[in-house]
Structure formats: C-alpha cells, structure tokens
C-alpha cells in the first residue's frame, strides 16, 4: 500500500514539473560526462607513469640508439648478454629490439613500404601493456601455432584478429598470425623519437601510432593548411590521404620462429643492483658511451623518475582545480534548480502531511524522486558514452569507460542525492 502511494506521488511530481525535471537531468548528464572525461584524462596521465614506476624507482640506465658490438668492427647487437658481461653490478638488462618488414611499393612515390617489428623479451613485454582494441596482448595468447603470432597497430591493410598477414623479407614471404589490434593514439613501450623536452621523463619510453598520417598531424595541432604543406614536402599531393606504416609487436619467443634477425636499436633498460657504487655507475656509463653504441640517449632512471613525478603532478595540479570548479558550478546549478522544484512541491507535501503522512515518509518520497532523476541521468550518460565508445568516436582520445570514471559518477550521484535530503 505504501509503495503504491509513493509511486503515485512521485509520478505526480515527475509529470507536474516535467520541464524542470528535464533541465535537472540535462545538468546532471553534463556533470557525469565531464566526470568521465576528466577522470579519463587524469587516469591516462597517472596510469602510464605508474606502469613503469617500479622500474624507474630503482637504479639504472635507459638507453636508445643503435647498439654496436664495438667501434672498430661494427655489427649490430642482437641480445643483451653481450652487454651485461661488460658492465659492472648489473641486476638484469631488458631490451626492445627492432626489425623492418616490406609490405609493398607506394604507387605515388615508388618508395618501398615497410612495417616495423618491435620484439620484446619477457620483462619488456610485461612492463607496459598497451590498451588492446581487439584481441589480446602478446603475453596473453593461449594459441599454439607454428606461425609467428603478433599484435598489430590499426592499419591501412585492414589486418584484423586471426588474419594471416604476409610480409616480404630477405628469406622470402613471412606469414604472421594477428592476435590483437592496438587502436590509434594508444601508447606502447618503445623509444619515442618525436619526444622533445628538456625534462626527459617516462614519456620518452612510450610511443603512439596513428594509422593515418593526416590524423596524426591533426592530433598534434596542425591546421589543414599546415598538413597540406607537410604532405607536399613528403612528395604527396596536398589533398592526399597518407597512411603510416603499421607496427607489429612480437615476443622474442614468437620472433624466433621467423629465423630473422632483430637488432637492439630501440630501447635498452639496464637495471643495477641496489648496492651499486657511484664508481661502478660511472664506469658503466662511460663504457656505453665509448664502446657499445651510437647513442640517441642514455638517461639515469632516477632522472626519468624525478622528471616524471614533476610532470604528472604538475598536470594533475592543473587539471584538478579546473575539474573541481566545473563540477561545483554545474552541481550548484543543479541543486539550485532542484531547490526551486522543491519549493513548487511544498503545497503537495503539505497536503500529504495534513492527510497523515509523516515527515519521514515525505523525506523518503523526496529522496526516491531526486534519486530516480539522478540515476536515469547517470544511465543515459554511461549508455551514451558507451555508444560513442563502441562507434569508435573516442578512438583518437584518452576517454575510456573503466571502473574509475564510473566510480566517480556513482560518488557524485550519491553526494547529489544526500545534498537534497531535508534535515
């Protein structure tokens, strides 16, 4: 009987003040969408650093460049054992190796088109796991196959999960089974050749890839005119749609099935033992600089870690006040509109009170009424964001629908309902 009464009264409130209710709902949807966007941005900034933080917390060197056997004889190194034997007090060395595969010939420029292979050892494959758009990451595959398995970036060839991709090599045609696809603008472990900063940080260790060069330039803030000039400088017409070469990711176990060589010309992580002395660090750094490689960089973990913390905290300190200000403005507006709504309902509540309804019952009706509007708004926000996400409209952004954005929305929903309880 009481449930029917509550339902009837709430139905009257919703119908009588439909315009105000829609206005409140739109404001709440704005709050939830802003929450999803801002939480995704903050999480993206923090989570990338958190993934590599355990490594950077220790002592060691992060190196990038072409690693040679020695200055006199040349010859690119293919494994880390040759380096470790020459260094002092090293715990382990992990690498990301590089290889090039031919995919065809560009019809406009007659240049050979290539795909780039990154080969991870066990440590580097698990150090940073990119967000997979389809399929699984290289360490998660449970398939047993004589054909090498790899993950690929989104690509103009249209290779998808379970496809057999073919590439030309010095040993003939190489067949690769695709087990996963990484979307545009997703980070992966590999030296970022485009990173320019006086504060080298974790961002130097992570690269991003776009299937389309036009989209990549647009993501960097290039105008349409600047993109046209850039394309012309590369030998294309100004209105061309130019595709980047795909990147493939292998474990060293899978790469060994190819009988092809890979070289240490991307990333090298040299982790020292905890008690390494300053003299041994100096020796290692000097040996790398003078004997082993044509270096792009060799940076201490401690420097990367300190700069990473500075950059992440700086960005969070910038974003948090903006997020809080927007939240408060929209939330206060929602509460204000709801206060007007409550004022309009005073007459109805007075009638119920005179009819025998107790204050606790009126409070329950008010909570259910406001909670219903808030929950419906939350469902619309999440459902709408999910539709956009599935449609790929967020593919070039950092917006995600993980548990963190949804948790923030639930907290805001609870705070909103509690703020409207008449004490």
What are these regions (language model features)?
Residues 421-423:
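Conserved small/polar residues in nucleotide/adenosyl-binding loops
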Residues 329, 335, 348-397, 408-412, ...:
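Transmembrane alpha-helical interface segments in multi-pass membrane proteins
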Residues 18-46, 310-350, 371-384:
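Hydrophobic alpha-helical transmembrane segments of multi-pass inner-membrane transport and secretion
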């Amino acid at each position: 009987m009481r449930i029917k009464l509550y339902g009837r009264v709430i139905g009257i409130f919703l119908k009588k003040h439909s315009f105000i209710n829609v206005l409140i709902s739109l404001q709440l949807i704005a709050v939830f969408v802003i929450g999803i966007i801002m939480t995704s941005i903050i999480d993206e900034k923090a989570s990338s650093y958190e993934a590599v933080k355990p490594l950077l917390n220790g002592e060691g060197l992060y190196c990038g460049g072409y690693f040679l056997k020695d200055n006199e004889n040349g010859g690119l190194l293919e494994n880390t054992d040759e380096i470790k034997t020459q260094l002092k007090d090293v715990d382990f060395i992990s690498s990301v190796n590089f290889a090039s595969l031919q995919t065809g010939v560009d019809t406009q420029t007659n240049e050979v088109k290539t795909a780039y292979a990154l080969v991870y050892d066990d440590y580097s494959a698990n150090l940073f796991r990119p967000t997979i758009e389809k399929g699984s990451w290289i360490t998660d595959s449970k398939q047993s196959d004589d054909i090498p398995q790899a993950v690929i970036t989104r690509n103009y060839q249209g290779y998808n999960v379970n496809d057999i991709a073919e590439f030309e090599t010095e040993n003939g045609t190489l067949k690769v089974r695709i087990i996963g696809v990484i979307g545009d603008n997703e980070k992966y472990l590999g030296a970022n050749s485009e990173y320019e900063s006086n504060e080298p940080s974790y961002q130097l260790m992570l690269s991003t890839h776009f299937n389309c060069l036009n989209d990549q330039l647009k993501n960097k803030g290039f105008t349409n005119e600047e993109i046209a000039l850039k394309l012309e400088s590369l030998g294309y017409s100004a209105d061309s749609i130019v595709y980047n070469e795909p990147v493939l990711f292998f474990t060293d176990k899978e790469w060994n099935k190819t009988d092809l060589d890979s070289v240490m010309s991307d990333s090298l992580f040299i982790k020292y033992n905890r008690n390494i002395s300053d003299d041994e660090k100096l020796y290692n750094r000097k040996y790398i600089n003078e004997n082993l490689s044509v270096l792009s960089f060799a940076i201490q973990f401690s420097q990367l870690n300190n700069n990473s913390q500075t950059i992440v905290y700086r960005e969070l300190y910038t974003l948090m006040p903006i997020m809080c200000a927007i939240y408060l403005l929209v939330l206060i507006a929602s509460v204000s509109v709801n206060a007007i709504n409550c004022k309009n309902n005073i007459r109805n509540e007075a009638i119920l009170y005179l009819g025998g309804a107790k204050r606790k019952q009126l409070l329950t009706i008010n909570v259910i009424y406001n909670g219903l509007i808030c929950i419906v708004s939350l469902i619309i926000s999440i459902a709408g964001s999910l539709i956009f996400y599935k449609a790929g409209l967020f593919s070039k952004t950092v917006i995600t629908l993980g548990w963190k954005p949804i948790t923030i929305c639930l907290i805001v929903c609870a705070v909103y309902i509690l703020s409207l309880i008449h004490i």
